[in-house]
Each structure stands twice: as structure tokens, then as C-alpha cells.
């Protein structure tokens, strides 16, 4: 008699736990598992999970009940884009998608891009850069931690007057590097491509820092590390902030966005 009663009570307890877990799953399941979730949110979670295995979940109270977001999706609602870690093709795809999405919502409201990156693939960084120049929104860049290599280029590419750094960040610029193997002709082709990218990057830095090409070439010949104040003097950023700016302090200058291109060789003289 007693074993049967205890077994029945255990089954009731198990059923109750299952029901409780089901209700919790409905309320607190991450939004990227929902059928109606957007591809952007699934992409955001997938890339963020590879970079950061533990993603905080934010639960909001709405008129329809509770809604859960991963922290990066919640920041995206506030028009904040995070560029964290090495810049590769997957990170570039994620950042570009967010920029285009925010422009589709409003092409006048500023976008805040927080950068903490050691750099990465040049072509991936240039894809983000071109998108920043392509969209109409003013882009406010923030350096937190470090902005090295391609990270410093993205920092400098923000809208004039809206490029910031926190006081203990580090900024580093240098020329592109790479390697090649194979036949001598293939190596020569790769070396020529790196030289073209080098000139292209010099032009971009010169455009956004207002420095001459000679100064840029000299500064980027080797790794050059800068404090935020030194980077401000160099022209990579505009302000070093300890506290968030007050309302109205970050009005961008209305300038025409132009894409910097690599210099072209002058045409060879023709003989007559």
C-alpha cells in the first residue's frame, strides 16, 4: 500500500515539474528559437555564440507579457552595433546586415558602433567600411579596449565630430601584412595585390585624419600604438570621453560622404 502511494506522489511531482519547465520554456526561451524570429536575430546569436559562449539574456515586460532578447539584439533596438573581436567575413556579414537594417528603419537617426577589435582580414574590414560610407545615417564610433589595424580604420571612418574613445583604450595603425606560397609568379601577384591594398588603406586614413600621404606612410611603416589623446591629435578620433555625452552634443557635421579609392598610376606617354 505504502509503495503504491509513494509512487503515485512521485509521478504527480514529476508531472508538476514538467509542467513548470514547459511554462518557463515558453516565457524564457531565447527569441531566436521562435518560428517568427527574424533571420538577423538568428544570425546575431549564431555569430555571438561563436565569439562569446555565454550570452546574457534580457527579459522585458511588455503589454503582451514577457519577452526575452539576447543582449546584442536588445542593443540593436537602441541602434547600437558591437564590433568585438577579430574582424573576419562572418563578423563583417553580421555588422553589414545590422547597418542596412538600421538604415531601413531610419536613414536619419545616428548609429552607434562600439569597437573592441585587434583587427583582422583587410577585405572584411573594407566591406564594413564601404557600408558605413554607403548608408546615409551618421555613424558614431566608440573605441572601448582597443582599435588596432582594421579596427582603427573603422574608428576613423565615423562621422566627423562623432568619433570617440574611452580614456584607457589603445589605438594602433600599421601597414597590411600577408603571406604567399607557390610559384614565383603567384607570389609576385600576391605581393602586388598587397601593395595595392596598402596604397588604398593609406588613402582612406589620409581622407579621415586629414593627414598627408607622406605622414600616413611614415606612421604606418611599423606598428604605431597611440593613446586616445595621441590618436585625437593624429585625427583618428575627435573626443576622449569619461561620461556619456549630453543631449545635443553629438550633432554630426553635414558632409558629403565620399569613398576613398586607391591611387591610379598616370597613363604612360604615347609616342607619335
Swiss-Prot record:
GO terms for biological process: membrane protein proteolysis; protein quality control for misfolded or incompletely synthesized proteins; proteolysis involved in protein catabolic process. One of its GO terms (molecular function) is serine-type endopeptidase activity. Residues 240-272 are annotated as: Disordered. The keyword Transmembrane does not apply. One of its GO terms (cellular component) is mitochondrial matrix. It comes from the Eukaryota. Keywords: Acetylation, Hydrolase, Mitochondrion, Protease, Serine protease, Transit peptide. The keyword Hydrolase applies. Residues 1-52 form a transit peptide. InterPro entries: ClpP, ClpP/crotonase-like_dom_sf, ClpP/TepA, ClpP_His_AS, ClpP_Ser_AS. The modification N6-succinyllysine is found at residue 196. The active site is at 149 (nucleophile), 174. It holds the Pfam family CLP_protease. Protease component of the ClpXP complex that cleaves peptides and various proteins in an ATP-dependent process. Has low peptidase activity in the absence of CLPX. The ClpXP complex can degrade CSN1S1, CSN2 and CSN3, as well as synthetic peptides (in vitro) and may be responsible for a fairly general and central housekeeping function rather than for the degradation of specific substrates. Cleaves PINK1 in the mitochondrion. Belongs to the peptidase S14 family. NCBIfam families: PRK00277.1, PRK12553.1. Fourteen CLPP subunits assemble into 2 heptameric rings which stack back to back to give a disk-like structure with a central cavity. Component of the ClpXP complex formed by the assembly of two CLPP heptameric rings with two CLPX hexameric rings, giving rise to a symmetrical structure with two central CLPP rings flanked by a CLPX ring at either end of the complex. This is ATP-dependent Clp protease proteolytic subunit, mitochondrial. It comes from Mus musculus (Mouse).
Amino acid at each position: 500500500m505504502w509503495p503504491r502511494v509513494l509512487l503515485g506522489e512521485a509521478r504527480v511531482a514529476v508531472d508538476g515539474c514538467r509542467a513548470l519547465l514547459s511554462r518557463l520554456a515558453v516565457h524564457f526561451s531565447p527569441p531566436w528559437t521562435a518560428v517568427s524570429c527574424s533571420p538577423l536575430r538568428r544570425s546575431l546569436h549564431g555569430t555571438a555564440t561563436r565569439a562569446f559562449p555565454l550570452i546574457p539574456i534580457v527579459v522585458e515586460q511588455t503589454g503582451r507579457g514577457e519577452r526575452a532578447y539576447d543582449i546584442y539584439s536588445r542593443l540593436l533596438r537602441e541602434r547600437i552595433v558591437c564590433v568585438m573581436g577579430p574582424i573576419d567575413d562572418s563578423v563583417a556579414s553580421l555588422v553589414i546586415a545590422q547597418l542596412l537594417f538600421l538604415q531601413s528603419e531610419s536613414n536619419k537617426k545616428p548609429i552607434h558602433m562600439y569597437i573592441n577589435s585587434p583587427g583582422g582580414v583587410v577585405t572584411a574590414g573594407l566591406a564594413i567600411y564601404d557600408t558605413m560610407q554607403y548608408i546615409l545615417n551618421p555613424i558614431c564610433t566608440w573605441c572601448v579596449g582597443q582599435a588596432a589595424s582594421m579596427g582603427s580604420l573603422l574608428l576613423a571612418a565615423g562621422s566627423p565630430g562623432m568619433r570617440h574613445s574611452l580614456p584607457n583604450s589603445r589605438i594602433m595603425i600599421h601597414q597590411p601584412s600577408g603571406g604567399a606560397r607557390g610559384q614565383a609568379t603567384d607570389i609576385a601577384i600576391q605581393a602586388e595585390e598587397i601593395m595595392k591594398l596598402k596604397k588604398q588603406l593609406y588613402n582612406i586614413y589620409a581622407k579621415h585624419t586629414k593627414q598627408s600621404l607622406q605622414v600616413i606612410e611614415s606612421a604606418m611603416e611599423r606598428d604605431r600604438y597611440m593613446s586616445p589623446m595621441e590618436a585625437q591629435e593624429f585625427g583618428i578620433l575627435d573626443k576622449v570621453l569619461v561620461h556619456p555625452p549630453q543631449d545635443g552634443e553629438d550633432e554630426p557635421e553635414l558632409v558629403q560622404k565620399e569613398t576613398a579609392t586607391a591611387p591610379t598610376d598616370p597613363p604612360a606617354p604615347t609616342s607619335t
